[in-house]
UniProtKB/Swiss-Prot annotation:
PANTHER family: DIRIGENT PROTEIN, DIRIGENT PROTEIN 5
GO BP: any one term: (-)-pinoresinol biosynthetic process
GO molecular function, one term: guiding stereospecific synthesis activity
Native organism: Arabidopsis thaliana (Mouse-ear cress)
Protein name: Dirigent protein 5
Cell compartment(s), UniProt: Secreted, Extracellular space, Apoplast
Amino acid sequence: MVGQMKSFLFLFVFLVLTKTVISARKPSKSQPKPCKNFVLYYHDIMFGVDDVQNATSAAVTNPPGLGNFKFGKLVIFDDPMTIDKNFQSEPVARAQGFYFYDMKNDYNAWFAYTLVFNSTQHKGTLNIMGADLMMVQSRDLSVVGGTGDFFMSRGIVTFETDTFEGAKYFRVKMDIKLYECY
């Protein structure tokens, strides 16, 4: 009988300790799924190059000459956003804001802008800001708010440079994932 009690006690303690160790492990967090997800293309034509009439952005300050990476240059833009890569497609929104080059030893810009939607599909705005590490293939900026169809939205915009034609034109694929939708 004493042998059975010892075996039972040992088994009981073993099970309690095993349960404690298992429950002490942190559960793995699964990635939340976006409540809205869509892709847009950002088209930028710089002022002062070949296509002045169709320019959608202009430098309002020039770099002061501190390096070879445009450090200090400030650009204001009002760029069309399309659902495909074609610049001639009907814009579904306008990206209105600015970016400035903020790194002396590599290309890097800091963006702050509003996507202004006025289409049959969406009405309202999304506010986006953050660092664009241009030399990285895929980079994320923050969606920090919105209005209308995007009231108080938050999320991530993943940038991928799709086309780059020097100081003339560039196109960025923007994968917009909203995680807070009201």
